[in-house]
């Protein structure tokens, strides 16, 4: 029998969970189809069909769903992430995402599978989170559970590499499970450290290497189109790039417990914990908060970080991205930011 | 033969060219309005430089370009250093004013705040998407009120009464000004209100909760406006210094940076020479249709020879200039660069670990019946507690 095709939008938490989904679908004998990388055309289509005041990551998501709708897939897989921790939810836009898609795209041909994800941790491999998927393809509970187990084990290997200092960017372009497996195995056995830990990194002529933590949601910092490829721009300028996904869960928890009242949103809390860790860390020269224009949760996070950066005397900058951001303004800002840190180092 | 370093600042409203010598003394200074053709203006500027100084005594040893239009002009000139205007401004003002603590810089298109400690810039802020409170807005309003921009600031000081004008947004500011005019406020009062609004806006958007310390330096094209300077002094309650060369500080700074870079690398300047004033430059653009990004690719042509290509996100057109063979290799990988490298690395590792990986895989996914059973049991238990959890959650 021909494998049925399930489309996965390359947007939002795709960057966090894609190894899990690739493995899961392969175990279930389904063919995952990933939407194209974000491009001008894809974003324009998304913007046209979105509410005008919604944030750009959601507009990107809508663009990706439209892209999949034209790819002749049997279903579109887009879970409703509700919670990954007790008493903490995700941003309301995640909670309402499937409804928003239904409302914004009444002409969508492809059926959407929208399981609700309610988990106690980042591990989302519970059967209850995949009931609709199982029903749609008449998968038995037993089969599903065994596939989920394998998927989560595979995802855990990916996560361990992230904790070791690899960037999601090092994997995110890969769509084939076989290639991903090989890359993961390779990195696991690689004696060479990842870029963020590389002490022998070479900066452009006569300049010093600096360490910068880029604090932002996975879908903002790893979507190369929407952020003007900031990660690679930083790398080219001789920067070791750090991100929240490298910080151990315990460290994040510990930092969070210092907050009198944690925020309501899962990934905002994660960013907070990681950012605090980096602000206190002497090995980090500066922190960039990369945020999408109009992001509600970040309006709180950004303020807290601004105040704390001053307290820890860490060089700090907020970069805002939106649908139409000229590349030159991003370059001007990151260049000036890096210059600040290099001057500081030179004078010490 | 003395060394001379050129600094060029291509702003949205003005184009500035300076030349400094080994001791950072200003040998040449030119401030021109950007009428829209930066290449021609730079050529004219260089021609003027050639007329004014005796070139036999000097050698151009370094060229730096800054400002929002820096990229294109850097290709035209063959610049050694291309850097953002924040670093350039900070460099120049900390040189002239080592005691500086706060630098206000307001240019044509954007405004900046630079915080300095012990002669080093430690923090900066730049206006976001909106152009309220920048030079071009003032230009526009001066034109609307029929006041030459040079007299604009002086008029503000003649105001008798205070008028409050909304400074948050240029559209609102303009409608506010019109209605206040209709109430009978005089031009000086309106202009004074506008200056105050501009400074208020600057404080709200850029300074925010930063603590400002002296000396206070005010530079950029707008610093020529004594009305704005007065409004700043009123707002912070201290004297504000406008440097002598406030209008070309960016150009001076980038010239100093070019000098540093050339010295560090020990290489000859890549300046294309004064002959470029006689060359014909042309820029053409086309929309690349090789992927869904449809980048606008810009070509810079000097005497019918392409000297630079820019604007492509993937870099394949930029690379096409370097050499045909290199270009061919790049064209293939253009839009899916990272995928290609991933595939490449996996291929490489294929060779290294071919046997190993198969073994590894086999081991990893070997089904151990005993273990499987136990895992399933564990999962089931988790499941149960999860289901209980779900009920709880529904009440949340």
Q: Which functions belong to the PLM regions below?
A:
Chain B
Residues 2-23, 100-116, 291, 296-300:
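Gly/Thr-rich phosphate-binding beta-strand-loop-beta motif of the actin/hexokinase/Hsp70
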Residues 175-204:
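Adenine-nucleotide phosphate-binding core of ATP-dependent small-molecule kinases
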Residues 35-39, 118-161, 169, 260, ...:
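Glycine-rich phosphate-binding loop plus the immediately following alpha-helix
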Residues 91, 135-139, 244-271:
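Glycine-rich phosphate-binding/hydrolytic loop that grips phosphoryl groups
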Residues 30-35, 53-86, 122-123:
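Short beta-strand-loop/turn "lid" adjacent to the catalytic site in phosphate-handling enzymes
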Residues 4-47, 124, 128-129:
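Short glycine-rich, Thr/Ser-proximal phosphate-binding strand/loop in the N-terminal lobe
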Residues 66-69, 197, 208-235, 243-250:
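Glycine-rich phosphate-binding loops at beta-strand->alpha-helix junctions
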Residues 260-331, 335, 350-357:
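Acidic, glycine/GT-rich loop-and beta-edge segments that sit at the periphery of enzyme/chaperone cores
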């Amino acid at each position: 029998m021909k494998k049925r095709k399930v489309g996965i939008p390359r947007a939002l938490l795709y960057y966090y969970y894609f190894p899990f989904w690739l493995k899961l679908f392969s175990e279930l004998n389904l063919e995952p189809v990933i939407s194209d990388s974000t491009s001008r055309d894809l974003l324009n289509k998304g913007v046209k069909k979105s509410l005008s005041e919604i944030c750009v990551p959601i507009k990107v998501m809508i663009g990706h769903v439209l892209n999949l709708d034209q790819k002749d897939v049997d279903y579109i897989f887009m879970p409703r992430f509700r919670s990954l921790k007790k008493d903490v939810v995700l941003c309301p836009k995640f909670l309402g995402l499937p409804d928003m898609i239904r409302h914004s795209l009444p002409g969508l041909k492809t059926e959407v599978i929208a399981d609700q994800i309610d988990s106690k941790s980042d591990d989302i491999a519970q059967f209850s989170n995949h009931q609709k998927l199982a029903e749609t393809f008449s998968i038995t509970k037993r089969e599903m559970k065994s596939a989920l187990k394998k998927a989560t084990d595979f995802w855990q290997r990916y996560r361990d590499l992230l904790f070791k200092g690899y960037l999601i960017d090092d994997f995110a372009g890969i769509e084939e499970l076989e290639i991903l497996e090989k890359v993961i195995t390779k990195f696991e056995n690689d004696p060479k450290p990842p870029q963020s830990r590389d002490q022998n990194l070479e900066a452009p002529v006569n300049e010093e290497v600096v360490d910068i933590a880029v604090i932002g949601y996975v879908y903002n910092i790893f979507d190369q189109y929407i952020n003007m490829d900031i990660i690679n721009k930083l790398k080219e300028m001789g920067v070791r790039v750090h991100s929240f996904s490298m910080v151990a869960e315990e460290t994040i928890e510990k930092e969070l417990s210092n907050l009198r009242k944690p925020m309501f949103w899962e990934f905002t809390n994660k960013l907070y914990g990681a950012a605090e860790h980096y602000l206190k860390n002497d090995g980090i020269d500066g922190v960039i908060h990369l945020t999408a224009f109009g992001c509600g949760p970040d309006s709180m996070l950004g303020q807290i970080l601004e105040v704390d950066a001053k307290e820890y005397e860490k060089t700090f900058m907020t970069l805002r991205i939106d649908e139409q951001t000229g590349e030159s303004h991003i370059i001007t800002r990151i260049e000036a930011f890096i210059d600040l840190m290099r001057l500081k180092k030179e004078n010490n | 033969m003395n060394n001379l370093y050129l600094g060029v600042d291509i702003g949205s409203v003005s184009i500035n060219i300076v030349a400094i010598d080994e001791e950072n003394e200003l040998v040449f200074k030119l401030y021109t309005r950007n009428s829209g053709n930066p290449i021609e203006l730079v050529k004219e500027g260089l021609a003027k430089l050639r007329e004014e100084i005796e070139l036999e005594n000097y050698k151009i040893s370094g060229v730096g370009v800054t400002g929002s239009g820096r990229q294109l002009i850097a290709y035209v000139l063959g610049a050694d250093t291309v850097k953002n205007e924040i670093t350039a401004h900070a460099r120049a003002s900390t040189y002239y004013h080592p005691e500086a603590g706060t630098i206000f810089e307001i240019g044509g298109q954007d405004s900046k705040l630079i915080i300095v400690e012990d002669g080093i810039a430690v923090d900066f802020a730049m206006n976001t998407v909106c152009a309220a409170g920048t030079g071009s807005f003032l230009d526009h309003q001066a034109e609307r009120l029929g006041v030459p921009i040079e007299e604009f600031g002086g008029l503000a000081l003649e105001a008798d009464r205070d008028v409050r004008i909304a400074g948050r947004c240029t559209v609102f500011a303009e409608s506010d000004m019109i209605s206040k005019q209709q109430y009978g406020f005089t031009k000086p009062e309106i202009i004074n209100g506008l200056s105050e609004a501009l400074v208020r806006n600057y404080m709200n958007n850029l300074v925010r909760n930063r603590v400002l310390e002296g000396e206070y330096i005010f530079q950029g094209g707008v610093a020529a406006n004594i009305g704005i300077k007065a409004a700043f002094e009123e707002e912070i309650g201290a004297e504000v210094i406008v440097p002598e060369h406030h209008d070309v500080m960016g150009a001076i700074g980038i010239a100093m940076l070019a000098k540093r870079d050339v010295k560090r690398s020990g290489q000859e300047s890549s300046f294309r020479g004064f002959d470029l004033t006689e060359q014909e430059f042309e820029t053409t653009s086309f929309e690349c249709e090789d992927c869904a990004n449809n980048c606008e690719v810009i070509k810079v042509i000097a005497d019918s020879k392409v000297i630079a290509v820019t604007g492509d996100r993937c870099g394949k057109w930029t690379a096409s200039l370097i050499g045909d063979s290199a270009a061919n290799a790049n064209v293939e990988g253009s839009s899916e660069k990272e995928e290609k490298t991933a595939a490449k690395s996996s291929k490489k590792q294929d060779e290294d670990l071919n046997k190993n990986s198969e073994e590894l895989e086999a081991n990893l996914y070997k089904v151990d019946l005993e273990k499987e059973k136990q895992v399933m049991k564990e999962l089931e238990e988790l499941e149960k507690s999860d289901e209980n959890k779900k009920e709880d959650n529904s009440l949340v």
